[in-house]
Design a protein with these regions (language model features):
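Cyclophilin-like peptidyl-prolyl cis-trans isomerases
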Residues: 1-164
Length: 164
């Protein structure tokens, strides 16, 4: 499964790790498919660290109105550029904000749920070109989620909150 994040600087293509972290990927895919991320800005950009987006307020303080638990997998590490992870305010506070790294960031392991990776160097070049306040135009999801009743119920509950 892939996510194609179309920005004003180009498209970032990412592999999503549904098999390892199905809840985190399902949350992201649901928000993307609803258009939640469309026209949001990259509100936090730190050279030689990461780019962050997903805040509906554009300040880093907003989210979808719900939180969910961290989801870590032993095989997923912040050991290279282009790692896609959830931003959070501490354990169990994942929502809609995410970041993509410029470099390896091992101190983030087991603190931020990794759920994807840029596909190639061209995608990383787009990541590296993003500046503060650049925008996501839209996110396209390529592929289908495996059906999981427990996760489907969580998505249904989240959508009730999002539909308010």
């Amino acid at each position: 499964m892939e996510a194609h994040i179309k920005t004003n600087k180009g498209t970032i293509k990412l592999n999503l790790f549904y098999d390892q972290v199905p809840l985190t990927v399902s949350n992201f895919v649901n928000l993307a498919n609803r258009g939640y991320y469309n026209n949001l800005k990259f509100h936090r950009v730190i050279d030689d660290f990461m780019i962050q987006t997903g805040c509906p307020l554009g300040t880093g303080t907003g989210g979808p109105g719900y939180d969910f638990e961290d989801e870590f997998h032993d095989s997923l590490k912040h050991d290279k550029p282009g790692v896609l992870s959830m931003a959070n305010a501490g354990p169990g506070t994942n929502g809609s904000q995410f970041f993509i790294t410029h470099v390896e960031t091992p101190w983030l392991d087991n603190n931020h749920s990794i759920f994807g990776q840029v596909i190639d160097d061209e995608d990383q070049d787009v990541v590296n070109s993003i500046s503060q306040n650049d925008i996501i135009e839209e996110i396209s999801i390529i592929g289908e989620l495996t059906q999981n009743n427990e996760i489907n119920q969580r998505i249904s509950d989240w959508n009730k909150i999002l539909d308010r």
